[in-house]
């Protein structure tokens, strides 16, 4: 449940209850109550209830809890006796006393019992000093808010460098757009100035031959070096010079591009001739391969005929032998 930046822990609640009990004990010691006051008079005991409720409400406020949070445990009988004693005094009312006035007295009086208590935490003294008074509450709230900001910054919720980078990027884009717009205006003005001041191609800003007669307006620009001209004329005139330089270099570029185009055309023609020659040689090779295949087939046929003729020759030899034998037998 959100408490407006304040934390309420169990240790702080226990410490406040112990401190309250010690304060009541010290009040009881400083203001001893007679035996008659502890009798059964209901009028004397009646303020104890509202006083206990007021004390519990003050404790809940010191604990920085919400208004609807549960009240701490009710004090013991000693607290009730102290309530009687304090109600008897005019300056002991809870409305007339401030927590800032009670804390130093209670802290000094509870110094000896606090050293003997084992249940108190080591940081009870700083907590006691910081948890009293609106200034302490304000300082604690600021500390909690700073911790919360640091926690958010560590998780990346707050990313200041990214916003700065975005701002720088937007500034760069705006500067680029402004420069582009200025360049466009400059180029347009340059074209207009050229159209107005250069009616014929003979008059230009380019360095020309000193022997030629030129208007007095351009004599200094003709004799001056290029760096001096660039330093003398503004940016618009510089863009005009660069444009004229590009115009003069355009014929040279055109000539070089025309020679390159001719060279490319010659190379394309040569490549075409080579392709045609390659195609012719490929066809010739295919024809030769076909001829070789036919010759191989003829060789195979001739080899078969040769084998048949050899077989026939062997058969004829055998027949000749048999005929010779028959003739030899007949001649006998």
From Swiss-Prot:
Its main location: cytoplasm. Residues 1-14, 52-62, 185-195 have a biased composition (Polar residues). The keyword Transit peptide does not apply. Residues 137-195 are annotated as: Selective for apoptosis induction in cancer cells (SAC). Preferentially phosphorylated at the Thr-155 by PKC in cancer cells. It is found in: Cytoplasm; Nucleus. The modification Phosphoserine is found at residue 223. This is PRKC apoptosis WT1 regulator protein. Induction: In ventral prostate following castration. Residues 65-79 have a biased composition (Low complexity). Keywords: Apoptosis, Coiled coil, Cytoplasm, Nucleus, Phosphoprotein, Transcription, Transcription regulation. Pro-apoptotic protein capable of selectively inducing apoptosis in cancer cells, sensitizing the cells to diverse apoptotic stimuli and causing regression of tumors in animal models. Induces apoptosis in certain cancer cells by activation of the Fas prodeath pathway and coparallel inhibition of NF-kappa-B transcriptional activity. Inhibits the transcriptional activation and augments the transcriptional repression mediated by WT1. Down-regulates the anti-apoptotic protein BCL2 via its interaction with WT1. Also seems to be a transcriptional repressor by itself. Residues 1-253 are annotated as: Disordered. The keyword Cell membrane does not apply. It comes from Rattus norvegicus.
